[in-house]
């Protein structure tokens, strides 16, 4: 598997994603950014439940709350647009990581999102190191930092 398999994804803009002006509702960009990195780790091979556990089934020792997020809109995104979403994860320090998402339409960047997560112990809420499998995903993703496939 090559990095583009888990770092370049697609998103089709649906009617329900848009507001009355016919462009995406502002909150959807951050939602799509989060969904993209969720999909990316699954494609990479990390079981979804290891990062986002169902606490009714089993209790995870780690949670990843969002501590910062941003969205920038560079051009209108409309119903029916097919977007490529390029993911760039980056380790900030032992307990923080950032995922940048670049949304491309017809080869042009139309939006970007940034989400920063903190790794915490579920009981104490103290900061803890990122789990090894997440570290491996970040490291493997950064091997090819200049994906030109959009």
Swiss-Prot record:
Pathway annotation: Cofactor biosynthesis; phylloquinone biosynthesis; Quinol/quinone metabolism; 1,4-dihydroxy-2-naphthoate biosynthesis; 1,4-dihydroxy-2-naphthoate from chorismate: step 7/7
Listed A to Z, the keywords are: Hydrolase
Q: Which domain of life is it from?
A: Bacteria
Q: Name one GO biological process term.
A: phylloquinone biosynthetic process
Q: Tell me the enzyme class.
A: hydrolase
Q: Cite the active-site annotation.
A: 19
* E.C. no: 3.1.2.28
So what family is this one in?
Belongs to the 4-hydroxybenzoyl-CoA thioesterase family. DHNA-CoA hydrolase subfamily.
Q: What is this protein called?
A: 1,4-dihydroxy-2-naphthoyl-CoA hydrolase
The organism's lineage is: Bacteria, Bacillati, Cyanobacteriota, Cyanophyceae, Synechococcales
